[in-house]
UniProtKB/Swiss-Prot annotation:
This is TRAF-interacting protein with FHA domain-containing protein B. Gene3D superfamilies: 2.60.200.20. One of its GO terms (biological process) is vestibulocochlear nerve formation. Interacts with TIFA. One of its GO terms (cellular component) is cytosolic large ribosomal subunit. InterPro entries: FHA_dom, SMAD_FHA_dom_sf, TIFA. Inhibits TIFA-mediated TRAF6 activation possibly by inducing a conformational change in TIFA. It comes from Homo sapiens. GO terms for molecular function: deubiquitinase activator activity; ribonucleoprotein complex binding.
């Protein structure tokens, strides 16, 4: 009996190019346990033709954690010029971070949401891709407040005396 594959559900969004940025992305991609490369190069498993994207921009790398019988994943930055933002962390060239169940990734103008659904197969995993019509990542902007206007001007700041 075949073991169920681990599933990565990947939503993609680009703010200016929209869905056309992902015209060559298949709806489903099954892959063995080697790193899945994303970039604009011919050797990338997921090819995106975007100007700021490196030929090998990032990889999704399956691995086995000690004591676990399930595939885990990390995301590795492969671009020497650009950086990759993952769940609030900025990754530079060859830095990597383990993925959790839900992950927010941003690079080269692309927003990507990756959901990991565990399966028991150790031979392969499958990615399902969805192009989102709206932003996937919201970074709150700093708000201006009147907080400082209520402080008396005659008092020295704390720690200055």
């Amino acid at each position: 009996m075949e073991k169920p594959l681990t599933v990565l559900r990947v939503s993609l969004y680009h703010p200016t190019l929209g869905p056309s940025a992902f015209a060559n992305v298949p709806p489903r991609l099954q892959h063995d346990t080697s790193p899945l490369l994303l970039g604009r190069g011919q050797d990338a498993h997921l090819q995106l033709q975007l100007p700021r994207l490196s030929r090998r921009h990032l990889s999704l790398e399956p691995y086995l954690e000690k004591g676990s019988a399930l595939l885990a994943f990390c995301l590795k930055a492969l671009s020497r010029k650009g950086c990759v933002w993952v769940n609030g962390l900025t990754l530079r060239y060859l830095e990597q971070v383990p993925l959790s169940t839900v992950n927010r990734v941003s690079f080269s103008g692309i927003q990507m949401l990756v959901r990991v659904e565990e399966g028991t197969s150790l031979e392969a995993f499958v990615c399902y891709f969805h192009v989102s019509p709206s932003p996937l990542i919201y970074r709150p902007e700093a708000e201006e407040t009147d907080e400082w206007e209520g402080i008396s001007q005659g008092q020295p700041p704390p720690g200055s005396g």
